[in-house]
Amino acid sequence: MQNPVASLLFILAMLTGPCPAADYPERTERTQSAGNHVWHIDPDKGNDGNPGTAPSTAWKSMAPANRLIMARGDTLVIHPGEHAVSLALMGEGSKQAPVTIRFMPGRHIFKHGALMTGKPQISNTNDAPNEPKAMAIRLMEAKNIRLEGKPGATDILLEGKAIFVCMEHAENVSLNGLGFDYLHPTMGEFLVTEVEGDTMKATIPDGILYTVKDGNLTWHGPGCEFRMGGYSKVFDSASGTFQGRFDPGKTVIRELSPGKISITFKEGSPTMKPGQSYQNRNTRRDCCGFFQYRSKNILWNNCHIYYMHGMGVVSQFCENIMFSHLKIAPRPRSLRTNSSWADNLHFSGCRGKIIVKDCVLGASHDDAVNVHGTHLRIIDRPAPNKITVRFMHPQTFGFDAFAAGDRIDYVSCNTLVPYASNTVSGVKQLNEKEIELTLQHPNPGNIQPDDVVENVTWTPSVHISNTVCRHIPTRGFLLTTRKPVLVERCRFEKTGMPAILVEDDASGWYESGVVRNMTISRNTFIQCGEAVIQIVPHAPRPEGDVHRNITITGNTFDLKNGTAIRIRHTGDVKAEKNTFTKDGKKIPEEKAVDIR
């Protein structure tokens, strides 16, 4: 059972914003479809005064569809063009006859400025909790829904910063054959084409907007503007790695022609080479690419994400999610080299099964996959069977983290070892960061200052297979869950940090929890950051094993330095039948593996 007060607050927050209310009516103001209807939307030739029942009588905008509650067998056919209104879908199909939203081949451009907005509270993303976030497609309490396009031919494009698809309290939703991109990416980029003396010449990829004034360059676009500098990476396409540096503060920039610039160094020599790309963004996490909240049975199949803003696909308190044949990478013939500000696939407090198979992940500034829960600090015990807990990280708070019936573990902040359990019987949201939990049983007597709790009801199993991870300056997979984890037959290419990282902490990101059953099998690791597999919980005063029952078998490591596996504070570890090489020569296991 979900916390009704927190759920209501979430829904009210999602309805907050400047979008015209007539375009996004409440459920009680909508008309119930009888089912098995086909409607058409044509932004170029349609008219919202039409019946919408045929291509020749299509609606012009999403507004008429937003006045319906869809039913089994309904199909909404959306023709390409410019969409000034978001699709705000309510309805319920059946498994045999789902509600189908069919985006026809072509470019579907969602315009900036008039889209539906809300204030969802998003894990690891909440730098701007009160800033409305635009949404192109929103599924609200929808069930048995199919979003579909033609692979390689149907593109959903954002003109400005927005969430592509936001779903909350949805069930049995699939996304099939869709491409997602920005007309004007919020990641600034340029490609160095020539270096001569103290000057570099560079090309800015199509679609990335900028201005040059007084020797400085400013990136801008609908909903986003910042001066070149700050957080940046240099990507070397020849090696597929991030290397080099560039400081625009020591340069004078001139525009030679549209999309062409020169960069003259006031001191020193050019620090980049022809073929290298400069990637630049601000660090304010104010949005994400996709947001899936309190939803279950979600399938992504044969989709391509070319670019998304902020944290990537965020699944928060969702159940049973599968990504199959998903590719996250720029368009093949584009000069762009980045597809995501932060993580590709981010899972916070999920349960059921997370399956990632046959995917290509990367081209981001952070991890390809991150699976974790959240540690909340115990700050008060107002009654023997009550505790007050607090979200501690400034980018993670405000969401419904507990419900009656959820089981919690009490965890030592020093050792990260759980020492007691309890069950939630009541939840009271005190403010955006503090929650009072009523528990079925009294609190243990040995709670120490700064100890934390984890919602262990919401912990998923994870199976990642046949997936490529590349063009990432950080980690490949971050995995902390007590349910079974299997990573098999994946390929990790030159990640800047460990390819697989298992941590758990109660002092930094507060990302939980313990690992109890993990197998890493038959994967290939090529020149990744070391240790390539690192299992090191952040326990300030370790006492006993935090993680246990981990098997690393049958993997192939091509090493840069020599450390393939580093493990601490973990019991029941098996590292066997792995192959280690460096510079083409085999390395014995005892030199490549460090377990203590």
Residue ranges and their predicted role:
Residues 237-285, 418-421, 425-463, 470:
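Small/polar beta-strand repeat architecture
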